[in-house]
Design a protein with these regions (language model features):
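A small/polar active-site loop signature that marks catalytic segments
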Residues: 121-155, 160-195
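Active-site SXXK
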Residues: 46, 63-89, 116, 164-168, ...
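Active-site Gly/Thr loop motif
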Residues: 192, 236-292
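Active-site helix/loop module of the DD-peptidase/beta-lactamase fold
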Residues: 64, 83-121, 143, 172-210
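Peripheral terminal and inter-domain segments
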Residues: 323-482
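Structured C-terminal helix/loop/strand segments within mature extracytoplasmic catalytic/sensor domains
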Residues: 276-338
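Active-site-proximal alpha-helical segments within enzyme catalytic domains
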Residues: 160-167, 206-227, 280-297
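A short, well-structured edge-of-sheet supersecondary motif
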Residues: 22-58, 282, 289-293
Length: 482
């Protein structure tokens, strides 16, 4: 098999007891519930047995993994602890020392490495919003007093993970991405990790771009207690501690997030998972010697996890003690993300004027920022079709696929060129345009009618990212808010 992105050996799905009917039931359940999957990798007993992508996403193109990045950061912390550079009981302000340049709010001086890892800093709101766009994020974190006793309460806290990355940078003298690659990613075959930065420092809490196979490999490393093909990469005992419940998350609204939290890992009765926004998962099932990794674009993301546990997990038959024979994995092909039916190509120009209305669930509009789009139009251009619109006050255009997805580029803010896959379809008087930002989970659908244009996202870009930020090549994400 070609186009691989890890050093995982391969075997046939049948040889390792992964039933084809389980995969078919999984895909059917997603389609029936309107769930958008982008990639799937299944690993059993250390062998890649299923791999594929849903067009226009590509199985060997890294995509933004969001909070799967947290597990990469935590792994670096575990290695630093194993090297004697940190300990779980270290107080963060003492490790940072002179890096703390401002006042330390009451309670912050008590916060330990363990509490950062388990998101139990005592804060009841995320500390990140006050940190992310500051030139001194450490000062911003230390200025936020915990609302409760450190160690007493769980709060999903991206700022805590950013600080873990800063601790690693400080005690190792290396960039986070370099330390991670040198110590544990390169043996997995991950040698060119891209990690988004702000003010010259990797996010830590997010920003890793990984293929679905690479997410599966990291999860498999954890399933194997930090040992990869006979070589110990993570310290002995680290995985056991990181993957068990460190603090209760019983108050979480999402049922799959209410079962407990470890060290930047979510716990559940059958195992644990690496978990990124909008269903980027590396699900570890220790008893079945299996890993199921998915990339996706869903808000909310509950449906993907439920389908994995309901359909894929039961399709893992008991293993025998027979040696595993090398073979080709089951290649998932011929699938594509949901696309509306229609009459065919546009038959003439369609123009709208004024702002593109935002049609999102109320909870999304309340929580997230969306790009300002206006004056959307679709017209003929050099034998094909083109979308024209105004983005953040500037005109831009992108060519459109019709009968199939077209991979091209959108010129976004500050002239940054963003990879997209596009498609356009007509249904009566309605023209639908889809822009898949294929370096990320995000897809924008524009609906144009005589009443104007409406935008809807499969899942909203996080952290105020401009459209220019939806690209692996965008080095420094900066806010783009009115």
């Amino acid at each position: 098999m070609t186009d691989r992105s890890t050093t995982l050996p391969t075997a046939s799905a049948a040889a390792l007891g992964v039933r084809q009917d389980a995969l078919e039931a999984f895909v059917t359940a997603l389609e029936q519930n309107g769930v958008e999957l982008h990639g799937l990798a299944v690993v059993r007993r250390g062998h890649l047995v299923q791999l594929g992508a849903w067009t226009p996403w590509q199985q060997q193109r890294p995509t933004l993994a969001y909070s799967v990045s947290k597990t990469v950061t935590a792994s670096c912390v575990g290695i630093a602890i194993g090297d004697g550079l940190l300990s779980l009981d270290d107080r963060v302000v003492e490790v940072l020392g002179p890096e703390v340049t401002g006042p330390v709010a009451p309670g912050v001086e008590q916060i330990t490495v363990h509490q950062l890892l388990s998101m139990a800093t005592g804060h009841t709101v995320d500390t990140l919003p006050a940190m992310l766009w500051k030139s001194d994020p450490i000062r911003a974190f230390c200025g936020q007093a915990p609302q409760a006793e450190p160690g007493s309460v769980f709060c999903y806290n991206n700022g805590a993970t950013w600080l873990l990355g800063e601790l690693v940078r400080r005690v190792t003298g290396e960039r986070l991405v370099d330390f991670a690659t040198r110590r544990f990613l390169a043996p997995l075959g991950i040698t060119d990790l891209h990690w988004q930065e702000s003010f010259g420092a990797e996010f830590g809490f997010s920003g890793c771009f990984l293929t679905v196979e690479q997410s599966a490999a990291i999860a498999e490393l954890y399933r194997c207690d930090g040992v990869w093909q006979g070589e110990r990469l993570l310290p002995e005992g680290w995985v056991e501690r990181a993957s068990r419940e460190q603090i209760s998350t019983a108050g979480e609204e999402n049922a799959h997030s209410a079962m407990g939290y470890g060290y930047q890992l979510w716990w559940h009765p059958d195992g644990f998972r690496l978990d990124g926004a909008f269903a980027q998962y590396g699900i570890v099932l220790p008893e079945q010697e299996a890993v199921i990794a998915v990339t996706s674009g869903n808000f909310p993301s509950l449906g993907v996890m439920s389908a994995v546990l309901e359909h894929l997990q039961p399709g893992l038959a008991p293993l025998t003690d027979n040696p595993v024979q090398a073979g080709d994995p089951e290649q998932i092909s011929g699938l594509e993300v949901p696309w509306p039916a229609g009459d065919g190509d546009p038959v003439g120009p369609v123009r709208t004027a004024g702002p593109v209305r935002n049609e999102q669930p109320a909870e999304a509009l309340d929580q997230w920022w969306f790009p300002a789009l206006a004056d959307a139009a679709v017209g003929a251009q050099q034998g094909g079709w083109q979308l024209q619109l105004t983005l953040a006050g500037q005109p831009t255009a992108v060519d459109l696929g019709t009968s199939a997805w077209l991979t091209t580029e959108l010129v976004a803010e500050q002239g940054h060129r963003v990879p997209v896959a596009t498609r356009c379809r007509r249904d009566g008087a309605t023209t639908t345009v889809s822009l898949a930002f294929i370096d990320t989970p995000h897809r924008l659908t524009l609906t144009l009618t005589e009443d104007g244009a409406v935008q809807r996202w499969n899942c909203p870009p996080l952290n105020g990212a401009p459209l220019a930020g939806l690209s692996v090549d965008y080095e420094t994400v900066t806010p783009n808010r009115a």
